[in-house]
UniProtKB/Swiss-Prot annotation:
Family the entry assigns: Belongs to the HscB family.
Organism annotation: Chromobacterium violaceum (strain ATCC 12472 / DSM 30191 / JCM 1249 / CCUG 213 / NBRC 12614 / NCIMB 9131 / NCTC 9757 / MK)
Organism domain of life: Bacteria
Alphabetized HAMAP family for the sequence: HscB (MF_00682)
Descriptive protein name: Co-chaperone protein HscB homolog
Complex formation: Interacts with HscA and stimulates its ATPase activity.
The keyword Chaperone belongs to this UniProt entry's keyword annotation: yes
GO molecular function: ATPase activator activity; protein-folding chaperone binding
Record-linked InterPro entries: DnaJ_domain (IPR001623), HscB (IPR004640), HscB_C_sf (IPR036386), HscB_oligo_C (IPR009073), J_dom_sf (IPR036869)
Residues spanning the membrane: none
Stored NCBIfam families: hscB, PRK03578.1
J domain: residues covered: 8-80
Job of this protein: Co-chaperone involved in the maturation of iron-sulfur cluster-containing proteins. Seems to help targeting proteins to be folded toward HscA.
Keywords: Chaperone
Amino acid sequence: MNHDFNQDFFSLFGLPRRFAIDAAGLDAAWRAAAAQVHPDRYAASSDADKRSALMLATRVNEGYQTLKSPLNRARYLLQLSGVDTQEENNTRMPADFLMAQMEWRESIDDARADVDALESLSRRLRGEVRDLQTELEAALDARADLDAAAVLVRKLRFMEKLDQEIGDAIESLLD
């Protein structure tokens, strides 16, 4: 059993190194790769081959989770290009984006007791997330503007946190 553990996730699944990917193609490639390296297929193999199969199965699943998520896929593309998104230590954002974040948080706080209002906010937020993903696709695939893409990744991370907050609020009301 000889596999290249250093190949990037796009190569692992036979996909072009782009932000815009064919989700169905990724799913099919993941299923095929996962079946090929499933540890049960190596039950009668040597311990070394079993370990190798387990490591590769883990890598296949990690790759799938990374590429399936637009945020993680964008981070990964930037990482492959040597760009650190600095999400932990660079919280500088354009003033208009910060104002929008404050408005979102106020709207969430105002709607905390109303499932319908929270679900409406969630739909609006998902629309904004789709817009950011479209901007990310343009920055990464069309323009190769890595600095702009890093800022968009930080914005998308903020938006995903808001979506989680809305989801948590809805869940607490339904419990």
